[in-house]
């Protein structure tokens, strides 16, 4: 069995990966996301970020044998504009106000790197999410929980913001941060059967 390494500090990703893998390591990536600027193609962008994270972690590994590194990046897009993590509460408010009553997309890029052979595969998942109309008070109350500040698009579907979601079309786990079905098929492609 190959040693699986998750290149992420995200507790949500770690929890999701534990659902399908009993044994894996966590090595946090120090990849500088600003070194991969957005150039108008969201799927390519999230896959490039995921690959950058996986490659960054692969350089930290001493034992090069039998290691697969999983990199992942998730972002929210609205009107073809990327919404990352909010800079401050004002930014979070503006993001949630824009998403209110509208449909947006959540993209996750995945990369799996075989450290020994340097073989890498990348893919992405897109999920459409529709928010109900939110009041300013609802948005402010949610932001004051602190839950919005470390999440793309300023919300976490698995938490209190779940009540904002009118409907979802696609992979729920993608919106949480790790599309398990796509990850499973990619791991199988790399010779790992769960």
Curated annotation (Swiss-Prot):
Transmembrane portions of the chain: none
Main location: cytoplasm
GO cellular component term of the entry, any: cytoplasm
Swiss-Prot/TrEMBL site (Important for substrate specificity) positions: 12, 74, 158
EC number(s) per entry: 3.6.1.9
Compartments where found: Cytoplasm
A GO molecular-function descriptor: dTTP diphosphatase activity
Cysteines paired by S-S bonds: none
Catalytic activity: dTTP + H2O = dTMP + diphosphate + H(+); UTP + H2O = UMP + diphosphate + H(+)
Domain of life (superkingdom): Bacteria
Keywords from the named record: Cytoplasm, Hydrolase, Nucleotide metabolism
A Pfam family this chain is assigned to: Maf
A GO biological-process term: nucleotide metabolic process
InterPro entries cross-referenced by the UniProt entry: ITPase-like_fam, Maf-like
Functional summary from the UniProt entry: Nucleoside triphosphate pyrophosphatase that hydrolyzes dTTP and UTP. May have a dual role in cell division arrest and in preventing the incorporation of modified nucleotides into cellular nucleic acids.
Family statement drawn from the similarity comment of this UniProt entry: Belongs to the Maf family. YhdE subfamily.
Entry protein name: dTTP/UTP pyrophosphatase
Species this chain originates from: Clostridium botulinum (strain Hall / ATCC 3502 / NCTC 13319 / Type A)
